[in-house]
């Protein structure tokens, strides 16, 4: 457990007690502090490492509650709402005792980041919504279904396609950590623009990624509804919206909508990326964040 304030931003892994729960995070790089919130929910943090950003930012990669080395809620697997996640981030920023931070959220982490920025704008120096969306639900799933069909058509005849599509189809119905991890590893090619053409680059990541089951329900068993469209029009935090052209789950349609909704935001579409532009086009990704 890291206890001394001077050590909280030293390089490496840290554990702190926040609101009675153990919170784990990892520090790399130097410069202004940027908290990075991974997707999932439940996916291990390390896929989100972005060495290019670490050249000019102190990256604080958060392991969200219920994930990896961070403690589970008593209501696990329920209760991991955006409000609860944002509360944890506020406590972490307080403990770090730093000025307003940069905040980068990827995928589900983007949903958390935009909630945080909307409710705690005074804590945020700049916001990066990376593969996020302003709303989820039926419309979001319909768009994802159409994008998956496009992916399947582009990759027709690939030996690994049936397994990847099966993983995508089954992952949402699983509640066992090991089975979810297996399905996640199976479906990962769908989340890249050109996975099979670049398999040597991404094979190790696919083999090591893990996921814990976290539901989409609050502690009372009610859905944690995401629809930020109205409130995003009031967001005054400087915001960069990033999306991969070939992302099937939070692609350009949602990035463009975020950009339209958020005043004075910037939009960058990574033309040869899927869901993981920081891995697929790291130089372009880094340049967009640095700008």
Each predicted region: which residue ranges?
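Conserved hydrolase catalytic core segment
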Residues: 99-143
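Acidic catalytic loop of the alpha/beta-hydrolase fold
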Residues: 246-250
């Amino acid at each position: 457990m890291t206890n001394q304030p001077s050590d909280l931003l030293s390089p490496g892994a840290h554990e702190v007690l926040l609101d009675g729960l153990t919170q784990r995070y990892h520090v790399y790089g130097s410069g202004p502090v940027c908290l990075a919130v991974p997707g999932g929910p439940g996916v291990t943090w390390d896929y989100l490492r972005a060495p290019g950003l670490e050249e000019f930012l102190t990256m604080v990669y958060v392991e969200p509650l219920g994930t990896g080395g961070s403690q589970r809620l008593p209501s696990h697997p329920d209760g991991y709402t955006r409000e609860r996640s944002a509360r944890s981030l506020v406590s972490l920023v307080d403990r770090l005792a730093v000025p307003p931070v940069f905040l980068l959220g990827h995928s589900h982490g983007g949903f958390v980041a935009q909630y945080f920025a909307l409710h705690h704008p005074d804590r945020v120096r700049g916001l990066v919504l990376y593969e996020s969306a302003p709303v989820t639900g039926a419309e979001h799933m319909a768009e994802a279904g159409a994008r998956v069909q496009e992916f399947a058509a582009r990759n027709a005849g690939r030996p690994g396609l049936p397994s990847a599509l099966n993983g995508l189809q089954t992952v949402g119905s699983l509640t066992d950590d090991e089975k979810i991890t297996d399905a996640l590893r199976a479906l990962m090619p769908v989340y890249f623009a050109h996975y099979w053409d670049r398999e040597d680059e991404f094979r190790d990541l696919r083999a090591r990624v893990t996921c814990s089951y976290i539901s989409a329900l609050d502690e009372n068993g009610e859905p944690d509804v995401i629809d930020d469209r109205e409130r995003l029009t009031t967001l005054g935090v400087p915001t960069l919206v990033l999306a991969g052209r070939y992302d099937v789950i939070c692609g350009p349609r949602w990035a463009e909508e975020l950009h339209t909704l958020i005043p004075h935001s910037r939009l960058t579409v990574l033309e040869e990326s899927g869901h993981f532009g920081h891995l697929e086009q790291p130089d372009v990704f880094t340049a967009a964040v640095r700008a």
